[in-house]
Every structure is written in structure tokens, then in C-alpha cells.
Regions:
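Long, charged/polar, soluble alpha-helical segments
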Residues: 1-209
Length: 209
């Protein structure tokens, strides 16, 4: 009986890293997001425990625990990635299906690179909460921007002689609204890039006052 107790104690001490990692997986509900992978990790852990309880030799579990910790890390990364980034992944996938790679290559590339950067961070440091939050926000902002550019690009492509002017006037109205808010003279007779330049200078002046 005492020998069995000793072996159980050895198992707990030897597997402390794996048991601690299992608590992390439980805290982020990996069993809910990836039940089969979570079950496999638990089965491997149980198998190692049984081996240690039988042999009482930590060396017998060294290699298998290293692999188990790698598997646990992979599961943690997948879970955190799903929780933090899946909505952004879905949006980017939808844009890709809508032809964004060809229609808005620069904006779409920016969005995919921002997502990849967030995924890379999670794969290396899944518990770096503040950094992950910042990268997720950057990826979300890039995806938001790409969706707006895609929608506007499709409007331009869909425009014909009956609604092309309305589209241009709507864009012009956006600049005019800024001018009105700044109490700036009506400059709609100027090219839009010149309107934009003058309004930007006026805003800069307001900020510096």
C-alpha cells in the first residue's frame, strides 16, 4: 500500500507540468471547442499516470510527457485562436470567396497579414493576453477596412450611366459634410484630392489652435 502511495506521489510530482497545463485547457474550455483533441490529451495523460503508478520511475514518462506537453500547447493555441480570431477568419474567408484577392488586392493583403500576425503571436505565446488583444484589434480593423473597400469597389463596378453620377455625388457629400462642420467655404468645384488636401490642412490647424 505504501509503495502504491509512493508511486502515486511520484506520478503527481513528475506530471506537475502536464497537470498544470490541463488546468489551463479546462479554464479556456478546450473540451467545448475541440472535444476529440481534448479527450485524446486526457487519455494520454491517464496512460502516463498508470505507467508511473506501476513503475514509480519518472524516467519512464519523460519522453511521453514531452510529447503530451507539445500536444497540450497545440490544443491551447487552437482554442485561443478560435476564441480570439475565428470571427475574423470567417470574414476574411467570405471576402476571399467574394473575389477580394483580385478586386482589392492591397486591402485584402493587409487584412490577411494582420490576421497571420495575430495567429503567429498566439502560436508562440498563447497566454500573452494584452499583446493578443492588441493584435486581434489590429486584425479586426484591417478586416473592417477591407470589407468597406470591397463594398465600395463593387458599387463602382456595378455602377452604370444611370447611377454613376449619384455615386460620385455621394462621395463628394462626405467631403462637403466635413467642410460644413469646419465652417469652411464651399470648395466642391475643386478636384476631390484638392478638397481633401485643403480640409486636412484646416483640420490640422484646428488641432494646433
Amino acid at each position: 500500500f505504501e509503495k502504491a502511495q509512493d508511486h502515486t506521489l511520484i506520478a503527481r510530482e513528475t506530471l506537475a507540468p502536464s497537470l498544470a497545463h490541463l488546468q489551463v485547457l479546462n479554464s479556456i474550455r478546450s473540451d467545448t471547442y475541440y472535444p476529440s483533441e481534448y479527450r485524446a490529451v486526457n487519455e494520454d495523460l491517464d496512460s502516463i499516470i498508470r505507467t508511473l503508478e506501476t513503475t514509480g520511475a519518472p524516467a519512464s514518462a519523460s519522453q511521453t510527457q514531452r510529447q503530451l506537453l507539445l500536444d497540450m500547447h497545440d490544443l491551447e493555441v487552437r482554442t485561443i485562436g478560435f476564441i480570439q480570431l475565428q470571427q475574423i477568419r470567417n470574414r476574411i474567408a467570405a471576402m476571399r470567396e467574394a473575389g477580394a484577392e483580385k478586386l482589392i488586392p492591397r486591402s485584402f493583403s493587409t487584412a490577411t497579414m494582420a490576421l497571420a500576425s495575430a495567429e503567429d503571436l498566439i502560436s508562440k505565446a498563447p497566454r500573452a493576453d494584452a499583446e493578443i488583444a492588441a493584435q486581434r484589434e489590429a486584425a479586426k480593423t484591417a478586416a473592417d477596412h477591407a470589407q468597406i473597400i470591397l463594398a465600395m469597389s463593387n458599387e463602382v463596378l456595378d455602377a452604370d450611366k444611370d447611377n454613376a453620377e449619384a455615386l460620385v455625388l455621394r462621395i463628394e457629400r462626405w467631403l462637403y459634410n466635413i467642410a460644413v462642420a469646419l465652417k469652411y467655404p464651399d470648395i466642391r468645384h475643386l478636384p476631390m484630392d484638392e478638397q481633401s488636401r485643403q480640409l486636412a490642412e484646416e483640420i490640422e490647424g484646428v488641432i494646433q489652435r
